Amino acid sequence: MILSSKYKLVILNLIGGLVIFFALILLRLPVLINSDQNLTADEALMANHIMDLLNGGPFYFYYDFARYFGITNGLAAIPFFLILGVGSLAFKLPAVCFYALYILSTYWLVKKIHPQAALTVVLLMIFSSPAILSLTTMNYGVGLICFLGNLIFLSFFNVKETGGTKAFYCFLLGFFIGFGIYTFTYAIVYIGSILILFVLSNNSWNTFRSKISIKVIASGYMAQKGGVQKFVSILDGIILFFILTVLFSYVFGGFGIDIAGFSIMQSNELHKPVGQLLVLVIIRICLFRQDVMDKLNSTKRLIRSTAPLIRRSILFGFLGFAIGIAPRTASIFTGETIRGGQGFDVDFVPTNLVNHFWQLMTHYIPDVLGLWAPILRLFDYRMNLFYFLNLFLIAIIVLLIGRAIVLFITTRWKDVKDIFRLKALSFNPAQFLLVLPILICAAVIVSQGPPATRYLFPLHGVVSILVAIYLQKIRHKSKIFFTFALVAWCMFSSIETYQGYVKSGMVRNFSIIKLPDHYSKILEFCNQHKILHAYSDYDTSAIGTFLSKGNVQIAEYTKTVWAYKSKERLAGKDDFAIIVRNESALKNYQKYLDGNLHSYSKNIVKVGNGINEVYYVFSSFKGEKGAIDRLRSLIVG
């Protein structure tokens, strides 16, 4: 039987994806073998949510701790739970799978931009920096949203290539946008990128741009007759702003604008602004209703003037978006989500902007590219053979990345200027490599919170694409240098990865070491003493609950909690213990117990060889019920 070209393509992509996945597994083997020891509290919190769901618990669309992050990454762990059993390894494997899909989808992207560089970019992304390797063993959904981001780009390119006449591509674009927003609102950088490219490459942009200048708006305002109409025109602007704010809050989860710590605007409540908007609309209609029908008729004429195929495609796009974002919509209608939250808080104080820019350029971007740690080692190591090898490889990698970026920007300098000036663009798929990094860096700089490596994750893919394109141009001139550059890249990544494993203790003399698991000892103690419910710090509560497979339910002993559903469940349990490892918390509990309870038991559980590697377990409390209940939330935090 002869397979058609489409089936062959599907099979080749499937095989390629599996090869990438297993190559990534091999490079991450020390971390995966020590998955219990490398499980983070955030991962454990998400894993507990999925474990409760599998055990028959209620279904929620979001985790306890946030409304900007759906449970897609956790649901992806269910097949691994069913095959491998509930555990850290099964929860971490989806992160590797997502990164494999991200690499495969990047291959598809490069096939549209520079087909000869597609395989090269796969190799470059497999041999990543230690920072990227670490992130792709943590099931935070970062690789997943980057994969969905690539699908958004690919769908957008197909829509542009077909002139928006293919309803299926518009449906896919809408679906991936909606589902990306639900999965992780970080998708906004991808949505913003295609929005900029769509607007600037639209044939009507120059005409529209000429009508939105300050001069045109001011003259239109002055042309209004009478004070009432002028006031109504201002009110129209306020109503438009309210509409956009409400839509943004419902879709993305709200935003906040601060200057020097002072809140200028917060968009947190979901339903309250809708009522305010209706009041404004009613006031507007009462003041001046004569032009309302004109505006409605203008809207109808605009819709009717659109070609039927385009109109059909737009409807399919909205349908796809509605289906993709349906989990978030359902969470709002069921009452699970009642606040937009502060998902996009920005602070425009100059010192904040300068500080974030400096951190970005001197630490976080070098860390994403794998240059931060080796450059630091140049100041620590003595001048031996490894020192000069390290210096040589750093020079090669910096040269490759620098030359690739400079070459790409200089050949598209007109596009760069037009993007910053908001001038019309002649569309080219490669332009996303200009817009996406600009949006990511700008978002990190203006963010109220400090920069983080995970928010720069897509830059790794962008740089890999640019280097792959540059190497393909070099290959036509010198295949020897092309091969040498690839070997240097892979060697640099491998050495840095090995150094990281050695430093963490997971590898010694090229052998993988199984690290001791501190949590197993405290869980063993709980099982021996029949402790089924306890309160502890964030890490111990989340990780301990998951590693015990829910047999020991541990909630946070702080007044402010992340896993509030877990704490609500334990509130009705009278028999509980307090597990403490923090010195400050130990003093607080010891003082409170001695001063407010009649009696209690205290046990010390040694979990390591270090002097501070101990847990203190308080249980068997005797005293007034109110005094005992206050133990559940004694720590401020």
Task: Label each PLM-derived region with a short phrase.
Residues 215, 220, 333-408:
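Membrane-lumen/periplasm interface segments of multi-pass, membrane-embedded glycan/lipid transferases
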Residues 135, 189, 267-277, 384-396, ...:
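Hydrophobic/aromatic-rich transmembrane helices and adjacent perimembrane loops
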Residues 53, 112, 149-173, 180, ...:
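Membrane-interface transmembrane helices that cradle and orient dolichyl/undecaprenyl
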